[in-house]
Amino acid sequence: MKIKNSLKALKERHRNNRLVRRKGRVYILNKTNPRFRARQG
């Protein structure tokens, strides 16, 4: 999982990326291609 300051560019890298908020953190999750997962930090 990558940790990035800004997730806007990462969200557009794959069409199945989903923006999810969990416990005050923002994640990008992708079920079809998990290598695009990222967390904002």
Curated annotation (Swiss-Prot):
One of its GO terms (molecular function) is structural constituent of ribosome. HAMAP family: Ribosomal_bL36 (MF_00251). Belongs to the bacterial ribosomal protein bL36 family. It comes from Bartonella tribocorum (strain CIP 105476 / IBS 506). One of its GO terms (cellular component) is ribosome. Keywords: Ribonucleoprotein, Ribosomal protein. GO terms for biological process: translation. NCBIfam families: PRK00831.1 (NF002021). InterPro entries: Ribosomal_bL36 (IPR000473), Ribosomal_bL36_sp (IPR035977), Ribosomal_L36_bact (IPR047621). The keyword Ubl conjugation does not apply. PANTHER family: 50S RIBOSOMAL PROTEIN L36 2, LARGE RIBOSOMAL SUBUNIT PROTEIN BL36B. This is Large ribosomal subunit protein bL36. The lineage of its organism: Bacteria, Pseudomonadati, Pseudomonadota, Alphaproteobacteria, Hyphomicrobiales.
